[in-house]
């Protein structure tokens, strides 16, 4: 495996790496289906100008280093990684406000971090050169 670079380890977080919200692609797809169903006639009250904006996320932030460690643990592997310089413009913490989709559509993600890590690893093993290669 190539070397994974974690950009920055000097942020004001518990382990020095950025914090982000991670979500499984299956949860995203299910959220998209719920939003697309809004465009049915009976849901006009939730639409403004045939437009609806919803953020999706788990409402839980994980540091980049926590993700790497979770990936290693979930899959029983050791990743080859190093810390690089910060990227210009990276926010210390980036978490979406998902209250609208939780409230209006009763959508919540169902797949946790450990399963996300396992599914990602299995996908990469099945498609080492990418999905369409």
Task: Give residue ranges: language-model regions.
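C-terminal substrate-binding subdomain of Rossmann-fold SDR/epimerase-dehydratase oxidoreductases
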Residues: 1-133
């Amino acid at each position: 495996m190539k070397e994974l670079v974690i950009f920055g380890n000097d942020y004001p977080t518990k382990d020095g790496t950025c914090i982000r919200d991670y979500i499984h692609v299956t949860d995203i797809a299910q959220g998209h289906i719920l939003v697309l169903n809004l465009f049915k006639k009976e849901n006009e009250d939730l639409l403004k100008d045939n437009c609806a904006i919803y953020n999706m996320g788990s409402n839980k932030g994980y540091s980049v280093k926590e993700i790497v460690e979770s990936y290693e643990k979930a899959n029983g592997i050791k990743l080859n990684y190093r810390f690089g310089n910060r990227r210009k413009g990276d926010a210390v913490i980036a978490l979406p406000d998902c209250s609208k989709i939780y409230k209006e559509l009763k959508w919540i993600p169902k797949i946790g971090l450990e399963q996300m890590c396992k599914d990602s690893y299995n996908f990469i093993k099945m498609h080492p050169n990418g999905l369409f290669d």
